[in-house]
Regions:
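Cleft-lining beta-strand/loop regions that shape enzyme active-site pockets
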Residues: 25-37, 46-53, 57-58, 112-115, ...
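Extended, small/polar residue-biased N-terminal targeting/export presequences
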Residues: 52-114, 158-162, 166-177, 183-190, ...
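Surface-exposed, non-catalytic interaction/assembly patches
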Residues: 322-338
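Conserved functional hotspot residues or short segments at active or partner-binding sites
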Residues: 331, 338-416
């Protein structure tokens, strides 16, 4: 047996290990079924080695198989070769690593942009939610996982990375260069829709955000404000712990979320009455750019009937991943648990369905109409600083207008 063949055999063993370990995630209920599939894999590997038209590069063949194996599970699971993992680890351990400000997934086989942080390198380069990346740094995204894509987009601050962007109405991808930067924590934009409605615009749920929201709510009560809007559009970052802590500011009883996985102990996150700060009316704004921790918050509010969730269905990306290193120096990013709403439905892929569905309209499109003749436009309360995030809400923002309408509607009288 030559060196290449021996390497292929070892690689096949790695695949067997991975397959056996995650077989249940794929829905296989017995080891026999898993190993039958492995037998087929071994036969295919042998035929490639012996019968392929040219002498195959078995490292490439096996790496491709492993990438495909992980990607077949879900959009967030990834496989890193030893070289890829070494690069990933260096960037992960470097606090000065530059980023682009994107939250990514995969759709239609390509990498797709879920959300873009305001004033981030990606936003400055003209990248928008919904953009499809055909390529990143010259590599086709149909052949890469979300983990690989994210790793390619990170690097030394001040350096650029080119992406090929597929956009509606254009036959060829646009070549766009994004210059990486060290990102600063996103600030919460505080606005007033009118004297009685506070608007908190969240573009991330960074550590400490729930405490910041608590302080704003307490301040609002002292000012005689009785209604709140939480804008979760473009909110795709932050730990779920912040979503749970935020939900507890509004929900006095019941379940907020449940975390379940094959090897993860079930965790039930419950409301805590002593943590409630706001008992008045509240509405949340969501759309397809709402993902991750923000979805856990939105689902808790919907399921506990704590207020209206207005807008569009969220993306569906609430899960937990684990980094697993392998003996050959490669690594897996494996989804090990999903978050479920209080009704027991998985948020992953399904997303959160709003209580009031309103089609999202891009603010730029609305502003281009030049209309400003109705509805109370929020008055910005914080200094006009680009680092604070997005611009003040437009009165032509249909999702915002509907939420304001619901909050200001007179209470429905109960039948006698």
């Amino acid at each position: 047996m030559n060196r290449t063949a021996r390497w292929a055999l070892v690689s096949a063993s790695v695949v067997i290990f991975c397959y056996a370990g995650i077989g249940h995630v794929l829905g296989r209920t017995t080891d026999d079924q898993a190993y039958k599939s492995l037998t087929v894999y071994g036969e295919v590997l042998q035929k490639i080695q012996s019968d392929y038209v040219d002498d195959p590069n078995m490292k490439v063949v096996t790496a491709g198989a492993l990438h495909g194996l992980l990607e077949s599970l879900d959009t967030q699971s990834s496989y890193f070769t030893p070289h890829e993992y070494e690069d990933y680890k260096k960037k992960l351990q470097n606090p000065g690593t530059g980023e682009t400000g994107l939250t990514l997934s995969k759709r239609f086989g390509y990498v797709i942009v879920i959300s873009v942080l305001p004033d981030s390198p990606a936003a400055k380069a003209g990248i928008h939610s919904g953009d499809i990346f055909e390529s990143i740094a010259g590599f086709a995204t149909r052949e890469m996982s979300v983990g690989q894509a994210t790793n390619l987009l990170t690097g030394t601050p001040g350096t650029g990375v080119k992406v090929g962007v597929i956009r509606r109405g254009k036959p060829d991808p646009d070549d766009v260069e994004i210059v990486r930067e060290k990102l600063s924590p996103q600030k919460m934009l505080v606005q007033k829709a009118d004297p009685d409605v506070l608007v908190l615009r969240l573009r991330s749920l960074d550590p400490g955000r729930a405490d910041e929201i608590r302080n704003r709510l307490t301040e609002a009560q002292s000012q005689g404000i009785h209604k709140v809007i939480l804008d979760l559009r473009e909110c795709g970052r932050g730990p779920v712990s912040e979503a749970v802590a935020t939900a507890r500011l509004f929900i006095s009883s019941g379940t907020i979320a449940t975390l379940r996985g094959q090897t993860v102990s079930n965790q039930v996150f419950s409301a805590e009455p002593n943590r409630v700060v706001w008992r008045g009316p509240v509405s949340l704004l969501t759309d397809a750019t709402t993902s991750g921790a923000a979805e856990v918050l939105a689902s808790a509010m919907v399921s506990n009937h704590r207020g209206d969730v207005v807008g569009e269905r969220t993306f569906g990306l609430a899960s937990e991943q684990k980094l697993i290193t392998l003996d050959d120096g490669s690594a897996l990013i494996l989804t090990v648990a999903n978050y479920y709403n209080p009704d027991g439905k998985s948020i992953l892929e399904e997303g959160v369905v709003p209580t009031e569905t309103v089609r999202a309209v891009a603010q730029d499109d609305a502003e281009s109409d030049g209309a400003n003749d109705g509805g109370a436009a929020p008055q910005q309360q914080s200094p006009s600083d680009p680092s604070l995030g997005p611009r003040p809400l437009s009165p032509e923002d249909q999702i915002y207008r509907k939420a304001l309408e619901l909050l200001n509607a007179p209470p429905v009288k109960k039948a006698a």
